[in-house]
């Protein structure tokens, strides 16, 4: 795609620094090179250059890099100027370059958008650039790089390829739809439905793992009232985020706090104490607590160490029974260990393993942090990539359409209905990589990028 306008923007952060970099991309870049450098540098070589203003006044000197189309990040002619890190020099250079006809400042994310529109990267890879820049943990950096290198795109493209092959097999027989459907075709359709379902399930699984890195592992702090749940949230997050009192039922709504534990991104969720109550407001809080518990990746179940051991076991067993079908990782925590002056270690009560802590004094908290990291690292898999909410929504749309198509086929054996569903599935999946997309979606995605990307 040829853009009439050429764009320019600083690649480096604003402010004083040792080096600042300007990037220029577009059809006028050769003219920019001739006017600012005096000539076009040798392609893909670092060239020492003087950066010229009007009337050949030297504004700065440094390194120029020339990437002729299509062998550049954007797929267009690209010039990069690496000069001294003075904001004033950068401003003078930008003013000089934008004075050239059809050259303007780039919008946020416009270089990446042009790379996408010119087929250099797909939409997943474009989003991965933004995710990589905004990564706050080592695991999310690795996952963003996997996406940038095309691992995520490969999963989606394999799924699309299966859908296209399926469509090809059945659409060729639509012209003969008034005839009895061939037994071999029926058999093929069932085989393809099974194959497609298996690939959907596999893709949904890896996307679910990828969303944990993007949004953080959801760790819900649950337990009876006054067990010290809010104190634990404060201790883990090094903050006074939650209100702590001796009055049972102080926490009545969900409280979220995003933290990083040794490079593991986590979202802590403090919940209302679980008990039977007639208080309507507290009951709503408890209902919300159960809702978020059932969607958790990990539950820290906190009970008061001063409670009788038989009662501790009863409370834990009741909780396990309530969420047994959800297959959620549970860590049992005995809080207020400082009040009984016991050792801060792990202990077994019958078959359950407990970690002893004092959220008030901070004792045992480091041991709990190490435990959370150990579980997270055991769950982490190489090759996981970042999955955005947009990706998850599109996969769910495609999978739900598939389930409907499968059901309709079993009931009606209508090839035309099946073909239409496969067409929709193909479109839903294509929107993930950008094969089918709208200008509004592109604007929303790329406007969140920083200028220069």
Curated annotation (Swiss-Prot):
Binding of GTP, residues: 226-231, 245-251, 270-273, 358-360
Cofactor(s) the protein requires to work: K(+)
Transmembrane segments: none
Cofactor descriptive note: Binds 1 potassium ion per subunit.
GO biological process, one term: tRNA wobble uridine modification
Residues bound to Mg(2+): 230, 251
Function comment: Exhibits a very high intrinsic GTPase hydrolysis rate. Involved in the addition of a carboxymethylaminomethyl (cmnm) group at the wobble position (U34) of certain tRNAs, forming tRNA-cmnm(5)s(2)U34.
One term under GO cellular component: cytosol
Alphabetical list of Gene3D superfamilies matching this protein: P-loop containing nucleotide triphosphate hydrolases, Probable tRNA modification gtpase trme, domain 1, tRNA modification GTPase MnmE domain 2
Organism whose genome encodes this protein: Buchnera aphidicola subsp. Myzus persicae (Myzus persicae primary endosymbiont)
Subunit composition and interactions: Homodimer. Heterotetramer of two MnmE and two MnmG subunits.
Protein name: tRNA modification GTPase MnmE
Residue positions binding (6S)-5-formyl-5,6,7,8-tetrahydrofolate: 23, 80, 120, 453
GO molecular function: GTP binding; GTPase activity; metal ion binding
SS bonds (residue pairs): none
Subcellular location: Cytoplasm
Residue stretches making up the TrmE-type G domain: 216-377
Underlying gene: mnmE
Classification via InterPro entries: G_TrmE, GTP-bd, GTP-bd_TrmE_N, GTPase_MnmE, MnmE_dom2, MnmE_helical, P-loop_NTPase, Small_GTP-bd
């Amino acid at each position: 795609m040829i853009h009439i306008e050429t764009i320019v923007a600083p690649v480096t952060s604003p402010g004083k620094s040792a080096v600042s970099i300007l990037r220029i991309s577009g059809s006028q870049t050769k003219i920019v090179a001739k006017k600012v450098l005096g000539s076009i540098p040798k392609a893909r070589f670092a060239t020492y250059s003087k950066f010229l203003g009007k009337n050949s006044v030297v504004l700065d000197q440094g390194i120029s890099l020339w990437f002729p189309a299509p062998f550049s990040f954007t797929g267009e002619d690209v010039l990069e100027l690496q000069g001294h890190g003075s904001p004033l020099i950068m401003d003078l250079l930008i003013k000089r370059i934008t004075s050239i006809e059809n050259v303007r400042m780039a919008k946020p994310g416009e270089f990446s958008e042009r790379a996408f529109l010119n087929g250099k990267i797909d939409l997943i890879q474009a989003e991965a650039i933004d995710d990589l820049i905004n990564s706050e943990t080592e695991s999310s950096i690795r996952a963003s790089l996997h996406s940038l290198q095309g691992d995520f795109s490969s999963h989606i493209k394999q799924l699309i390829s299966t859908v296209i092959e399926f469509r090809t097999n059945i659409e060729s027989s639509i012209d003969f739809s008034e005839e009895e459907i061939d037994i071999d075709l029926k058999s093929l359709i069932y085989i393809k439905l099974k194959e497609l379902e298996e690939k959907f399930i596999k893709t949904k699984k890896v996307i679910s793992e990828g969303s944990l890195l993007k949004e953080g592992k959801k760790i819900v702090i649950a337990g009876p009232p006054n067990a010290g749940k809010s104190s634990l949230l404060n201790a883990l997050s090094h903050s006074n985020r939650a209100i702590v009192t001796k009055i049972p039922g102080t926490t009545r709504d969900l409280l979220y706090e995003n933290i990083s534990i040794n490079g593991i991104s986590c979202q802590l969720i403090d919940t209302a104490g679980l008990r039977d109550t007639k208080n309507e407001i507290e009951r709503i809080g408890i209902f919300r607590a159960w809702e978020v518990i059932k969607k958790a990746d990990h539950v820290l179940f906190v009970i008061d160490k001063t409670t009788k051991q038989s009662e501790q076991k009863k409370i834990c067993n009741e909780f396990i029974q309530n969420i047994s079908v959800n297959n959620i990782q549970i860590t049992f925590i005995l809080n207020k260990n400082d009040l009984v002056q016991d050792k801060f270690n792990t202990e077994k009560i019958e078959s359950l393993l407990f970690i002893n802590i004092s959220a008030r004094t901070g004792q045992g908290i480091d041991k709990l942090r190490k435990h959370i990291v150990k579980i997270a690292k055991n769950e982490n898999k190489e090759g996981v990539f970042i999955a955005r909410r947009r990706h998850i929504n599109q996969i769910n749309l495609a999978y739900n359409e598939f389930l409907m198509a499968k059901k309709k086929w079993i009931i009606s054996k209508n090839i035309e209905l099946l073909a239409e569903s496969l067409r929709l599935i193909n479109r839903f999946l294509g929107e993930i990589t950008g094969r089918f997309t709208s200008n509004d979606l592109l604007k929303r995605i790329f406007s969140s990028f920083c200028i220069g990307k």
